[in-house]
Amino acid sequence: MNVKVYNLDGSEKGDIELPAVFETEYRPDLIKRAVISSLTAKLQPKGCDAFAGYRTSAKSIGKGHGKARVRRTAQGAGAFVPQAVGGRRAHPPKVEKILFERINKKEKLKALASAIAASAIPEIVSARGHKIEGVPSLPLVVNAEFEGLVKTKEVLDVFKALNLAADVEKAKDGIKIKAGRAKLRGRKYKKPRSVLVVVGDACEAIAASRNLAGVDVITANDLSAIHIAPGTMAGRLTLWTENAIEKINGRF
């Protein structure tokens, strides 16, 4: 299957043959598993001190005194038990807990292929909430000169020429302050995702693009399901460079 390649000003440059991965069957179940696997891989095991709450000289006086048989200090205050001040936790976190959702290598690769194919289906992209009115084609492939851009304004001009700016504005308007403790822990804002830019190799356009609201930039070799289907929802609006298409063809 061939698609149009567009210049930085939005004009057509020519055609490019898409890799066979863009014709992969849509498997939302596999995509969900792969994304959850990537998310849980970031979790760190946690546990408590094995002797937390146990460092006390409190003793139980046994039965027959008309009071609960909890361990007590010399002053008569309860200790050691979960309901006592300074006592142990009832069910503390265990480092042995399995946090990571495992997935087979072939399943993970199949999920990525399915997510890539879903990004080329207008109905799925639109259902995800992206603004695709006026976007020339899906998948959207741009001239390799895009990777040489050094200014965010230059990238934004390309987005305007390809009618991607509306999706960036939608993401910018959707930035909200979170409720609760997250504000105090370095994750104050909820930021919607907009355009994903896939480039061939590390280039200047990475720094130029990532300052736009909701825009993520990734190289073709580092692309995974978590980038192209964030939140387990496939169909992210994606801008590919010519070099990225060639690299993807080599991965599958």
Curated annotation (Swiss-Prot):
The keyword RNA-binding applies. The keyword Ribosomal protein applies. GO terms for biological process: translation. InterPro entries: Ribosomal_uL4, Ribosomal_uL4_dom_sf, Ribosomal_uL4_euk/arc_CS, Ribosomal_uL4_euk/arch, Ribosomall_uL4-arc. Keywords: Ribonucleoprotein, Ribosomal protein, RNA-binding, rRNA-binding. One of its GO terms (cellular component) is ribosome. One of its GO terms (molecular function) is structural constituent of ribosome. One of the primary rRNA binding proteins, this protein initially binds near the 5'-end of the 23S rRNA. It is important during the early stages of 50S assembly. It makes multiple contacts with different domains of the 23S rRNA in the assembled 50S subunit and ribosome. Forms part of the polypeptide exit tunnel. PANTHER family: 60S RIBOSOMAL PROTEIN L4. Belongs to the universal ribosomal protein uL4 family. Part of the 50S ribosomal subunit. This is Large ribosomal subunit protein uL4. It comes from Methanococcus maripaludis (strain C5 / ATCC BAA-1333).
